[in-house]
């Protein structure tokens, strides 16, 4: 399971948030783990953002000051070809890919940068546009 709209920015490049999904762990526990990992870089209790999780399908969750809820699928595909690295030394910030219907308000910790990138790629009748 991985986040497809939130990444770490590091001294070496962009890093994915991914957690190996095991059958004995429910999805809500994994979402909480993603939020826990993000809490090292942003103030969760003061921030509002969306988590788009991809396993076999894409699921949307909203984190509003620490309260997490599932939201309707907006059919955004988050399919831009992005480059990622595995090895890094220093985290410099967090990157959020947002859409016109997924606003965010992020309060960073410890001088971390917050980067926002907008996408409008949606899934229409079997096509990614």
Curated annotation (Swiss-Prot):
Domain of life according to the entry: Viruses
Localization: Virion
Induction (UniProt): Expressed in the intermediate phase of the viral replicative cycle.
Keyword Phosphoprotein: no
Keywords for this protein: Virion
Pfam families attached to this UniProt entry: Chordopox_E11 (PF06138)
InterPro entries in the record: Virion_core
GO cellular component terms listed in the entry, alphabetical order: virion component
Family of the protein in this entry: Belongs to the orthopoxvirus OPG073 family.
Stated name of the protein: Core protein OPG073
Biological source species: Vaccinia virus (strain Western Reserve) (VACV)
